[in-house]
Amino acid sequence: MLYDELVSLIDSKNTIYKELNDSIYSAKTDEEYKQASIRKKHFVHVYSQELYDFLWSRLSELTAKNCIAFDLVPYIVWAQLSERYSIIIDTVKKLK
């Protein structure tokens, strides 16, 4: 099911996201903090792009009910995805 696959993808990405947050929290020097922050920023971009790509590739299966999975996406990732997500939703509406 699309919902289960989407939740699985989000869960796996959220695990990495948490590890990156932890590395920022655990940074001992300014340089470690800076590098950890850069890694997190890059990952947020990758995470949002992978969600977009997944959704776009499964567009014909996407329903409003499946979209409840997006409640699990961190806000910072959602903020990057939301503009592209509206394109997907508009396309889904046209298909149905």
Model feature map: region roles:
Residues 1-31:
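Short terminal alpha-helical segments
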Residues 30, 38-88:
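Acidic, low-complexity, intrinsically disordered interaction modules
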Residues 92-96:
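Short acidic DE-rich linear segments
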